[in-house]
Amino acid sequence: MLKNAFSKKFKFKNWPKKNFPAVAAGIYVIWDEQTLLYVNTAGKDLDKAQRAGKTKFGLITRLNSHASGRAASDQFCSFLANRIVIPSITSGQLSKFRDGSVTLDQMTKKYIRANVEYQYLVVDKFQDALDLEGHCKRGAIFGEKPLFNPLD
């Protein structure tokens, strides 16, 4: 089965993972316990990045962005903030937002580091990642569609 080609699950609390491929194209999936949250690809212009001598590109930079918790600049973080973090904010936490002692990005990053895991698969051809992404988003690989970005 294709799902067995993916890495094991790694916790974002341990990001960055040792020995993670520094320059690589691929597909990744993000989990909250047993719920598939998000599927995406990274590394579209891998050849160009390699020719330019980039030392970090593709999967590592995308997952690093997700680990940051910055909702304004990262689609996954925006989905997570809007669908999971904001609905769980308590009245006590709201007062901390008002006085500036807590930000949405801080809460999103905290949630990611405490609860979220990722898996990835490095590919030689980016088109393979795109093809697999469609299958994952339709529920064909993991038996469920991602909560945040499914395809019909």
Language-model region placement:
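Alpha-helix-centered segments that form part of catalytic cores
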Residues: F97-Q119
